Amino acid sequence: MRAETAGAGGGGCTGPGVADTAGPGPHPAMRRAFPGGGRATLGLIAPLESFSGDVPTMEGHLARVCAAEEAGFASFWLRDVPLLVPGQGDGGQLFDPWVYLGALATATSRITLGTASTVLPLRHPVHVAKAAASVDLLSGGRMLLGLAVGDRPGEVPAFGPAAADPADRLPDSWAYLRHLTGDAVTTGHSSPLGELAPGTGLVPEPAFGRLPLLMTGRGGRTIEWVAEHADGWLYSALAPEIQRANTARWRRLTGESGAPGSKPYAQAGYLVLDEDPRSAPRPLPQGWAMGREPLLDLFKTYEAGGVDQLMVNLRLNSRPADEVLAELAEYLLPHFPTPEIHPAARASHLTVRQF
């Protein structure tokens, strides 16, 4: 069965989606988040909140995401944190990512929505495919699926023996998910994770072409494996000289940014934006801490080094997140503009037909 959109969806914070301008070629979410050609964009990682402790309040969260969309940020990324593990100190964005993505798909209308990342080996590929295709359809083609094996080993035993070695499980999970969200969705698939009979397909079928699957980190794989199987690579914050070597190797395997068939490279980290715009950089594990002027210079260095998107997490700021977002929007976003790729018309109702 295949679900087809029929009519524009209900409005979001900036109004409903408009007529589809996607056409053939890359998925519309990829074109907006990663325009390529040496141009980087700015993305945000949930939660959009400055806080101390393990779990955010999530007060005013939808309004803040809407404000980020209005300002022109390219994408908003959610994390997959099912359990609060003692000593880990991180409850993610509190809400289940798929439930939250459903809310965001209707509350927003342009910003790309992604996971960074779904811990694929802890979820069955059929369920991940169903959820991602649903969000993509509801949002008008704005879904990017970042995948990882996870960095929280304390969670793994809660999922039973089948999840005991997430890195070993990744290739089978990835292949099954790719089959379900790709082009040949009715040919059948045989996997240690399940048997999909010929003629059995996902519903809704991906409505805007093959869903992009992005790798976070390496997942216990080689960079060659990532380059072959993923549609893009999300990596943690690196010093510019290390990042440049990383992206150079990636480009040798996948092609230059913006060229036909090339694959994007994004870099994610915590950002503490000082009130003094000239405040010098200081060390911050997995991130950056400084004023906006050296930050702009640093991000331009990353852009020149081949980074297609810089993804920032604001949770460690002592200043309110609204204030930090406003400063980024005024002083950094003009240097990293998001292309005007309109989403497809969202479904107000669905027409279902047989294969």
Walk through the language-model features, giving the residues of each.
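Short, acidic/polar
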Residues: 55-68, 131, 215-225, 290-302
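Hydrophobic faces of well-ordered beta-strands that scaffold small-molecule active sites
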Residues: 42-46, 76-78, 113-115, 143-147, ...
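Flexible, glycine-rich active-site loops centered on histidine and acidic residues
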Residues: 39-56, 120-189, 237, 241
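An alpha-helical appendage that flanks or caps ligand/catalytic pockets
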Residues: 13-38, 164-207, 236-355
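Acidic (Asp/Glu)-rich catalytic clusters
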Residues: 32-37, 69-70, 101-110, 132, ...
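Active-site mouth loops of central-metabolism enzymes
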Residues: 46-59, 118-126, 208-218, 280-293
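N-terminal beta1-alpha1-beta2 module of alpha/beta enzyme domains
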Residues: 1-107, 211, 315-319, 327, ...
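Conserved, mostly hydrophobic/aromatic
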Residues: 72, 80, 104, 135, ...
